[in-house]
Amino acid sequence: MIPPSFEYLTPSNISDAVALLQKHGDEAKILAGGHSLIPAMRLRLAEPGYLIDISGIGGLDYIQEESGQLRIGAMTCEAALEESEIVRSIYPLLLDTAKMIADPSVRNMATVGGNLAHGDPANDHPATMLALRASVVAEGPNGTREIKIDDFFPDFFTTALAEDEILTEIRIPSPPSASGGAYLKIERKVGDYAAAAVACQLNIDSSGSIENIGLGLTNVGSTPIRASSAEELLKGKKPDENMLAEAGRLAAADSEPMEDLRGSAEYKRALVNELTQRAIKLSLQRAEGSR
């Protein structure tokens, strides 16, 4: 299907892009890599009258550690995450996630910021950022503000960004020693949206007990979901098989899947149960290996 006509705008900096958003309001959409927005436009799920392309704006594609956090520019492509030595050595959850997005040609174009700003619960990074307890930086006419990721997805295909704000950066707390993470996903074919997926990030103490844990669920609700019941169960514990099974059950209970072409709600809850247990086990193994 061909999208309806629109006016294509190419601002030279963020301030100009914000001014265009102010001018055109809800008729405008930001275009970054286009991996999420363009397919939605072709299906006429999004019909902007104005498309504001920020891909030519410099200074928004970086990955750097600074002041106890990993800072990722919103225009950083998925392939850059795969290639980053910082990500490969310290953030296995991010690496797992980037590798599972579509195919290499798409990952060379699709951006981390776009994956979040589209507000799609089927996208992979929202759950990953929940597990990592990230925050995002938004820039608008009144300056910049930082938004916790738990507050960023209030509803289906909706974000906390104002109409005249642009997501410019993602900030992730640097993990302590003995940390590990994993992203596990079931899809009908490679590169497809998940039937269900689970992101886990944790760190352990000297005895192997979990000090802190984050669990995010992909595509099993109208928004990305934090499996808070399972997090609360596991914090401060050294889980055995029975506790892992209970964590899986609790995560499945926190999910809110709907039946679609990827499976029934019951099937998706079963996936969440199993993937949660596997993601925690793999994260624990990686945490032990990072001591």
Where does each model-flagged region fall?
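C-terminal structural segment of proteins
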Residues: 1-291
